[in-house]
Amino acid sequence: MHLLPELASHHAVSIPELLVSRDERQARQHAWLKRHPVPLVSFTVVAPGPIKDSEVTRRIFNHGVTALRALAAKQGWQIQEQAALVSASGPEGMLSIAAPARDLKLATIELEHSHPLGRLWDIDVLTPEGDILSRRDYSLPPRRCLLCEQSAAVCARGKTHQLTDLLNRMEALLNDVDACNVN
């Protein structure tokens, strides 16, 4: 289910392309839920800027896939189907996992908090009925910025940081994980 980093497109995505990609992801999610009446993990990489498919985002994605599969194995949860693809919004993974949706969401939240690359992952859990379990459902604060302790959304809206600084931080986190062989 991994993606080859060397095949990244480096396409600068437009806002309309991004919106279409998100609509297509939602349609894929609903199709998966019809095939598998178990919770669905929909996984993407948080990638600032217009280039969503790069060697870096694919490598970050691959670490996330490995971590999600290890989480399922550790918990004894069966992955019924899994797939990886690339859309205009970057690498995307979907895993149908036979587990209680609430337990799955809590475990993925813990994964996002404990893994060194967790801040770069956006892991959604959808119930078999198609409801997205949100961080807010668990009284969790919004995601933090990669460079400061502000809300990531506030920094993004205000363009608080230079894109190059954010991308450099992403790459530094990835290189640290690769150097330590963290999965």
Swiss-Prot record:
Task: Give one GO biological process term.
Answer: prosthetic group biosynthetic process
* TM stretches of this protein: none
- Catalysis performed (reactions): apo-[citrate lyase ACP] + 2'-(5''-triphospho-alpha-D-ribosyl)-3'-dephospho-CoA = holo-[citrate lyase ACP] + diphosphate
What Enzyme Commission number(s) does the record list for this chain? 2.7.7.61
User: Is Nucleotidyltransferase tagged as a keyword?
Assistant: yes
UniProt KW Transferase keyword: yes
Keyword list (alphabetical) reads: Nucleotidyltransferase, Transferase
A Pfam family found in this protein is CitX
GO MF annotations, alphabetized: holo-citrate lyase synthase activity
Task: Give the similarity note.
Answer: Belongs to the CitX family.
Function summary: Transfers 2-(5''-triphosphoribosyl)-3'-dephosphocoenzyme-A on a serine residue to the apo-acyl carrier protein (gamma chain) of the citrate lyase to yield holo-acyl carrier protein.
Record protein name field: Probable apo-citrate lyase phosphoribosyl-dephospho-CoA transferase
Organism, by scientific name, is Escherichia coli O127:H6 (strain E2348/69 / EPEC)
| Name of the gene | citX
